[in-house]
Amino acid sequence: MSALEWYAHKSLGDGIFWIQERFYESGNRANIWLVRGSEQDVVIDTGLGLRSLPEYLYSSGLLRDRAARDNAACRPLLAVATHVHFDHSGGLYQFDRVAVHHAEAEALARGDNFETVTWLSDSEVVRAPSPGWRARQFRVQAVQPTLVLQDGDVINLGDRQLTVMHMPGHSRGSICLHDKDRKILFSGDVVYDGSLIDWLPYSRISDYVGTCERLIELVDRGLVEKVLPGHFNTFGAERLFRLASNYISKAGICHKVSTFAMRSLASLALRVTNSRTSP
């Protein structure tokens, strides 16, 4: 299957494109965002990486065609992972320039498929990307980040800037990217319109509460009008406020006890199926 078949996209205007993996039918299917700038283009999250995402970007015309890739006028391309979970980081190995938060840089560099929580089934991939492909073969490949991010860093695209916000809770290195001028938040799995997951090996409820308080502050200060999340549909500031507030209100003792049990089971299952280093 070609990259043009595997991916699909739609334009949200203002240089932003929403890309998805058509034949990965799962709640884990991540949104991939392309943000075009005057001096640099940024891909936010890369999906599973079962087909070449860079090839799709050039072949579909979203970026300059392959013949122009080495041209001095061709803008550089940076792939940013909002966190290293497999559904977001699987395609990072396809890019020359890769950025991730420092808390997860080591896990990515060694191909730690326990921390990337790799968990994929044949039933979720409704058309095999290549003959004989099986989900049990899938692993997140080790990638050495070329840019290690910290809270407050700014990724300069020329005519727009994306500010890095370290937002742990879902994972220890989760980030949002905030376009302050346009009041857009690329939220990864920090927040999306669904049940927030805080029971994975490196999830932490206390961190998540702090993150949600920070999200509420963004809304209260009028700094976010649109959220482009890591899963499901986009939403606005009012919904962001409600999702963050609901998480805080539910993060009591009962929730912590049930989450501890779920995390223990998830960690056991992931340790059985995944190694801490890439083969």
UniProtKB/Swiss-Prot annotation:
Annotated cofactor note: Binds 2 Zn(2+) ions per subunit.
Modified residues (N-acetylserine): 2
EC number: 3.1.2.2, 3.5.2.6
Family per record: Belongs to the metallo-beta-lactamase superfamily. Glyoxalase II family.
Descriptive protein name: Acyl-coenzyme A thioesterase MBLAC2
Subcellular location: Endoplasmic reticulum membrane; Cell membrane
Originating species: Bos taurus
Binding-site positions, Zn(2+) 1: 83, 85, 170, 189
Its job: Acyl-CoA thioesterases are a group of enzymes that catalyze the hydrolysis of acyl-CoAs to the free fatty acid and coenzyme A (CoASH), providing the potential to regulate intracellular levels of acyl-CoAs, free fatty acids and CoASH. Has an acyl-CoA thioesterase activity towards the long chain fatty acyl-CoA thioester palmitoyl-CoA (hexadecanoyl-CoA; C16:0-CoA). Displays a substrate preference for fatty acyl-CoAs with chain-lengths C12-C18.
Keywords annotated in UniProt: Acetylation, Cell membrane, Endoplasmic reticulum, Fatty acid metabolism, Hydrolase, Lipid metabolism, Lipoprotein, Membrane, Metal-binding, Palmitate, Zinc
Entry coiled-coil feature ranges: none
Gene Ontology terms for molecular function: beta-lactamase activity; long-chain fatty acyl-CoA hydrolase activity; metal ion binding
Lipid group attachment sites (S-palmitoyl cysteine): 254
Main location: endoplasmic reticulum
Pfam families noted in UniProt: Lactamase_B
Cofactor: Zn(2+)
Single Gene Ontology BP annotation: fatty acid metabolic process
Highest taxon of source: Eukaryota
Reaction catalyzed: hexadecanoyl-CoA + H2O = hexadecanoate + CoA + H(+); dodecanoyl-CoA + H2O = dodecanoate + CoA + H(+); tetradecanoyl-CoA + H2O = tetradecanoate + CoA + H(+); octadecanoyl-CoA + H2O = octadecanoate + CoA + H(+)
EC class of the enzyme, as a word: hydrolase
Record-linked InterPro entries: Metallo-B-lactamas (IPR001279), NDM-1-like (IPR050855), RibonucZ/Hydroxyglut_hydro (IPR036866)
Residues the entry annotates as binding Zn(2+) 2: 87-88, 189, 231
Reported modifications of this chain: Palmitoylated on Cys-254 by ZDHHC20.
